[in-house]
Amino acid sequence: MIIIPDCSVRSRPHSRTVLVTVAATALAAGCLLAALCLGQPSVGPAAALAAVTDPEHPLRVAVVEVRLPRALLGLVAGAGLGVAGLLLQDALRNPIAGPELLGVSSGATVVVAAIVVLGLGVPLALQPWLALGGALLAGALVLLAIGRTRDPAHVVLVGAAMSAACGGLVVAVVGLGTQGNVVVLFRYLLGSLAARGWPHLETVAPIVGAGLAGAWLLRRRIEALTLGDEVAAGLGVPVVRTRVAAVGLAALLAAAVAAACGPIAFVALLAPHLARRATGTTSTRRVLPLVAVAGGLLLVAADLAARRLLYPVEMPVGIATTLVGVPALLLLRRRRQPRPAVTG
């Protein structure tokens, strides 16, 4: 067994992590209930719960067939994105690593765009696995270009280059499609939970569940990587295999979400940072459950805000997360820049 010492920056009681996780879970449940209540028509919490439990309830179609799968998909997709961000940040020892910044999400998007625009008729259940191929290819190219450097600025530049290249491929694919397919693709590229039903949830949930289980099994080895490659190797951790497995799991999670919801940025970046700040620990194994809950909470809350901000017009959730995520990324980058020395 690999014994990993607690690598928290600050020593805090484990009970704080449990307490914060329980509180975040309660907030996520509240957002789920709010998602069932809001819409046209709006209903109260009691009526929403009655519609879920009563097959004959007049609002059952609106609540159970439209709102419930959308909200549950938000929780599942957010959890997958959050854990994908945690895996990449800890395995690469880079606090601003994420599927959207390493080109992983863009690689998956290219594959799904080709399926949509070219009308290939690929079954929904198969699309995440094809998207995984694009995600793994893009991620592998970025990792090869990064090499051994851990400089966040260099990683962001390489990831931005890969995202730009994938964006160019999407534009090229658009030129081959019909007007109707291009409209569908445009809506997909904005990132949204709208018009998603039980088939989308049934496709994504098992894949995300498998990815979360894999992350849980690797949590101690990934935490060892945060101590440095030499220390991790000294603890008996196969460094290269663990890092490859972590990136592969992150690509799997990001590809599944991208196939069902489109590219949704910055949930993967923010969820791990919020979890670490709330608990006061950087321990991978301690914050992993909280990161999953925080990711789901962020995405469902963002979707609620997107639905109500410009009501009755609905903003795609991908735009809402970007509006919050870009300033957060700039803030994180600014905090990491060393202050100039004072002389004289």
Question: What residue ranges belong to the model's regions?
Answer:
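Alpha-helical transmembrane segments in inner-membrane proteins
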Residues: 1-344
